[in-house]
Every structure is written in structure tokens, then in C-alpha cells.
From Swiss-Prot:
Belongs to the arsA ATPase family. ATPase required for the post-translational delivery of tail-anchored (TA) proteins to the endoplasmic reticulum. Recognizes and selectively binds the transmembrane domain of TA proteins in the cytosol. This complex then targets to the endoplasmic reticulum by membrane-bound receptors, where the tail-anchored protein is released for insertion. This process is regulated by ATP binding and hydrolysis. ATP binding drives the homodimer towards the closed dimer state, facilitating recognition of newly synthesized TA membrane proteins. ATP hydrolysis is required for insertion. The active site is at residue 63. GO terms for molecular function: ATP binding; ATP hydrolysis activity; metal ion binding. This is ATPase get3. Homodimer. Keywords: ATP-binding, Cytoplasm, Endoplasmic reticulum, Hydrolase, Metal-binding, Nucleotide-binding, Transport, Zinc. It is found in: Cytoplasm; Endoplasmic reticulum. One of its GO terms (biological process) is tail-anchored membrane protein insertion into ER membrane. Its EC number is 3.6.-.-.
């Protein structure tokens, strides 16, 4: 089981995310879980709380479904943009496919594929897409570009559903394999390509294949450095989001085991959509569902006694817009007390 970070003499893990806010050395915070359990709402709310205690916060969606724009009622794209009503909270949504196109281009500002004139653009793109997990790797390549050019004290990831997230965290290996393949191709075809490119004026910016590979190697080194930070519990943590149902609990356990195998810290679980029927309620469905939820909540308490387990209620309306998100975010730091 994953190790929890216990602060001070407090052996009873409080049912909030206050420990995440208090840990001011954190630079990377991932929020993830099974699809449909409220990851985006939780990540947006956590980012709002972080903005109260940190100088600058960046919220990034790596989920192809991109729900940040819907959550805040504001359009976000691949460039970081301040969220309306905040001076230190920005958001962006990454398009993995667009990132691949950017990587294959040389960055001359025109967005043109330098291989297109050789009839090799599609081949290189097919090669990139054929590498398992390359969309997650490209997402992170885009993230690195933003991180190196902009300065944020803490970055919150609204991640894709579990499988994508776990692959996303393995991206250094994926990139190294891709670089090995490109190096092999360069050895075989580099001289020929350089001579052809020379006859055609070379790559945009006067680069050759060797320079392109050097850039890729530089990117790999940067990614290796970030990967080291990911495995440092002082700098990185993963907040699991689930609901009190069998499949979600099973997925959460699998995810925590994998995170532990990657040496990535996780000590917080947010359980969403909990029912708290009033005493004497004649709603049979509510009572039956609460009974089922309680069974899985008890299992969560038993399995993760060294975790901060946050219980969030099922709400009567969608959590969309700044005001509702701020109200929801308060329950992440102040335990919800159901009405009697």
C-alpha cells in the first residue's frame, strides 16, 4: 500500500485536502480516477483553494474530453490563460494530436512539416502515432514547453481516465524508445536525408537531421529531470477521486498500487457523490443507495487508514461556474456536515 505523509503528531488523517495546501514545496499535483467520478470538478476546486495560498497556479487538462472550459464557463486552449475573476490562477487544455504536429514541425512559426516536401510527412506522423502512449508523451512535451516559458509555483493536472493517466506517468520510457527508433532511422537514412535536404535548401532554419535529434535529446534530458521530481514526495502528489461503488473502488486500488510501483506519492482520496438521506426519510432508493455506499466507504476507511479521505456530498445541481466551484471547493478543506 502507498505510504502517506503524516504531518506533525497527527496520527488521525483529517478528512480534508488541507495537508496538500499546507505542503508548500509541492510543484506537481495530479488529480485522477475512473471516468465520471468528478475529477474535473475536484481539480478545479483544488486549484481554487491553492490560488489562495500560492503565488501562481496553473490548471492543465490532459483529458481529450476537455471539461475545464465547461466547468468555468470560459474557453481555454493550448495556451495558458488567466481564469476570469482570478489574478494568479490560469488554465489550459492540451490537444495531444496538435502537439505531435508541433513536434514534427521545426518550430519556424509557420507550422509546416519539414518532411512534407519529401513525401515523408505522413510516414513520420505514422511512426509517431504507432508508439504506444505517444499521445500522453506528446501531452507532456506540450506541458514542458509551457513550463519552461512560463513560471508557475504549482501545477495541477486534471488527468484523463485512469489508463491514460498511468501511461502518461510512464512517458520518459516512451520517449526514450521513440528516440532510439529515430536514432536508428538517422543512422540508416541520415546521410541520404541530409544530402536530399541540402539539395532542397535544408530544413527550415538551416537545421539538419543531427540538429533535430540533438533537440530531441535535450527534450529527453529535461523530461528525465521532471520525472525525478515526480518521484519526490516533497514535490509531487496524486489525489485520487472515486465514488463509493465497487468498480470505482477497484480502479482506485489498482491505480494506487501502480502509483506506488512508480514511486509516486499519494495520500489523499476524494469520495464524491455521497448520499446523506435525512432520518425518517421515506425515499427507499436513497436509503438503499446510502447503505451500499456505506459498505464501500467502510472498505475505503479500512484499506486507506493512512490516507486523507474526503467525503463529498451528492448535490442537487451541477457544479459549473466560478461561484459554485468556490462553494464546492470549501468542502475540500472544511468537512461536509450533512443536515439533520
Amino acid at each position: 500500500m502507498s505510504s502517506a505523509v503524516v504531518h506533525g503528531d497527527d496520527l488521525d488523517m483529517e478528512p480534508t485536502l488541507q495537508s496538500v495546501l499546507n505542503q508548500n514545496t509541492l510543484r506537481w499535483i495530479f488529480v485522477g480516477g475512473k471516468g465520471g467520478v468528478g475529477k474535473t470538478t475536484t481539480s478545479c476546486s483544488l486549484a481554487i483553494q491553492l490560488a489562495k495560498v500560492r503565488k501562481s497556479v496553473l490548471l492543465i487538462s490532459t483529458d481529450p474530453a476537455h471539461n475545464l472550459s465547461d466547468a468555468f464557463g470560459q474557453k481555454f486552449g493550448k495556451e495558458a490563460r488567466l481564469i476570469d475573476g482570478y489574478s494568479n490562477l490560469s488554465a489550459m487544455e492540451i490537444d495531444p494530436n496538435g502537439s505531435i504536429q508541433d513536434l514534427l514541425a521545426t518550430g519556424d512559426g509557420q507550422g509546416e512539416d519539414p518532411m512534407a516536401g519529401l513525401g515523408m510527412g505522413n510516414m513520420m506522423q505514422d511512426l509517431a502515432f504507432s508508439i504506444p502512449g505517444v499521445d500522453e508523451a506528446m501531452s507532456f512535451a506540450e506541458v514542458l514547453k509551457q513550463v519552461k516559458s512560463l513560471s508557475y509555483e504549482v501545477i495541477v493536472f486534471d488527468t484523463a481516465p485512469t489508463g491514460h493517466t498511468l501511461r502518461f506517468l510512464q512517458f520518459p520510457t516512451v520517449l526514450e524508445k521513440a528516440l532510439a527508433k529515430l536514432s536508428q532511422l538517422s543512422t540508416q537514412f541520415g546521410p541520404m536525408l541530409n544530402s536530399i535536404l541540402g539539395a532542397r535548401g535544408g530544413l527550415p532554419g538551416g537545421q539538419n537531421m543531427d540538429e533535430l535529434l540533438q533537440k530531441m535529446e535535450s527534450l529527453r534530458e529535461t523530461i528525465s529531470e521532471v520525472n525525478t521530481q515526480f518521484k519526490n514526495p516533497d514535490m509531487t502528489t496524486f489525489v485520487c477521486v472515486c465514488i463509493a461503488e465497487f468498480l470505482s473502488l477497484y480502479e482506485t486500488e489498482r491505480m494506487i498500487q501502480e502509483l506506488t510501483s512508480y514511486n509516486i506519492d499519494t495520500h489523499s482520496i476524494v469520495v464524491n457523490q455521497l448520499l446523506f438521506p435525512k432520518e425518517g426519510s421515506d425515499c427507499e432508493q436513497c436509503t438503499a443507495r446510502r447503505k451500499m455506499q456505506k459498505k464501500y466507504l467502510d472498505q475505503i476507511e479500512e484499506l486507506y487508514e493512512d490516507f486523507n479521505v474526503v467525503r463529498m456530498p451528492m448535490l442537487v445541481e451541477e457544479v459549473r461556474g466560478k461561484e459554485k466551484l468556490e462553494k464546492f471547493s470549501e468542502m475540500l478543506v472544511t468537512p461536509y456536515v450533512p443536515p439533520q
